[in-house]
Amino acid sequence: DIKHANRLGCTVIRVIVNTPPEIMAKAAPYAEQYNVRLGLEIHAPFNFEHEWIQRHLDTVYKVDRPYLGIVPDMGIFEKRFPRVRSNRYIRRGAHPLIVQYISEVYARHEGFDRLLEDVKKMRANELDLAMANDIQHMTYVTPRRLLDYMPIIFHIHAKFNEMLED
């Protein structure tokens, strides 16, 4: 992949999160040889504090080569559950009050441990439970955390469900 990226003129490869840090370390000299930086994607439900990501960050700093870094996925900075996704659940048959409850739990960034149990008590249907499971795979990190990692951020990965003024 590194060689192909170089031949295509690409200088950054987004490495998926399940790649072991040891593989990244071993690939660093090869990446340097081909002038292709390897950036581990930090994607929800992972975040900068997750043990697996910490192992990668330790490797990046230990190897200390300019060809190892990170590619944060902007999904880890979702402050609220996107309305377009909530509305899709409702259109497909989820209960509006349960959708609202789940969205409020996510907005507080706490209570995830009891969410599924609480939603089941609300006589949830399959779609309500799917949404409750959906947010279990989301995370919120303050965007200010990017400042801590600026020297090793090679690129970002993003999709936009919606954008609000704040």
Regions found by a protein language model. Give the residues of each.
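Active-site acidic/histidine proton-transfer and metal-coordination neighborhood
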Residues: 1-119
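Glycoside hydrolase catalytic-domain groove-lining segments
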Residues: 83-166
